[in-house]
Amino acid sequence: MAPKKPEPKKDDAKAAAPKAAPAPAAAPAAAPAAAPEPERPKEAEFDASKIKIEFTPEQIEEFKEAFLLFDRTPKGEMKITYGQCGDVLRALGQNPTQAEVLRVLGKPKQEELNSKMMDFETFLPMLQHISKNKDTGTYEDFVEGLRVFDKEGNGTVMGAELRHVLATLGERLTEDEVEKLMAGQEDSNGCINYEAFVKHIMAS
């Protein structure tokens, strides 16, 4: 019967173990420190007051008529929801990405797309901005977008990383389209001067 006596000691050891357990509780406190938020790029905000309207009075009248076709307000308030903005832009011959539409809208929350309203005077500068960018592109926007990947801050990005960006983000390109754009752009280290690359794209 003597060999059974050590068993309570095992229980004692188990009982003692939890006393050491609270020590690791301090570990979770370190988690908030690793917040990558500051590294996200800051896009220039759309400022309607800086947009110069270059449309003719006749064009503006046509745009207004099209705008009013999307007016779903009960009393005909001559307004559309934020969520309809992209539809109206496309009805007027523009082809903005959803990201571009959200940008000119001030990046509203999902629930605001159906609740917030705008009148034609608010919409017109957005149309002017999208229309102008469709033809000329925005060199600064492209450069700013690629600068995020410039880890060394020396004006270059890795060719492999740029290929990934072109193939997966925004207006996705096929592998062949990416290779045509990248042809002759990489240096001996496999890096690309992104400002020169943007000029190359916009000139082609």
Swiss-Prot record:
One of its GO terms (biological process) is regulation of striated muscle contraction. N-terminus is methylated by METTL11A/NTM1. One of its GO terms (cellular component) is myosin complex. Residues 1-47 are annotated as: Disordered. GO terms for molecular function: actin monomer binding; calcium ion binding. The modification N,N,N-trimethylalanine is found at residue 2. Keywords: Methylation, Motor protein, Muscle protein, Myosin, Phosphoprotein, Repeat. The modification Phosphoserine is found at residue 188. Residues 58-95, 137-172, 172-204 form the EF-hand domain. The modification Phosphothreonine is found at residues 97, 136, 138. Residues 1-14, 37-47 have a biased composition (Basic and acidic residues). The modification Phosphotyrosine is found at residue 139. CDD domains: EFh. Residues 15-36 have a biased composition (Low complexity). It comes from the Eukaryota. Regulatory light chain of myosin. Does not bind calcium. Myosin is a hexamer of 2 heavy chains and 4 light chains. This is Myosin light chain 3. It comes from Mus musculus. The lineage of its organism: Eukaryota, Metazoa, Chordata, Craniata, Vertebrata.
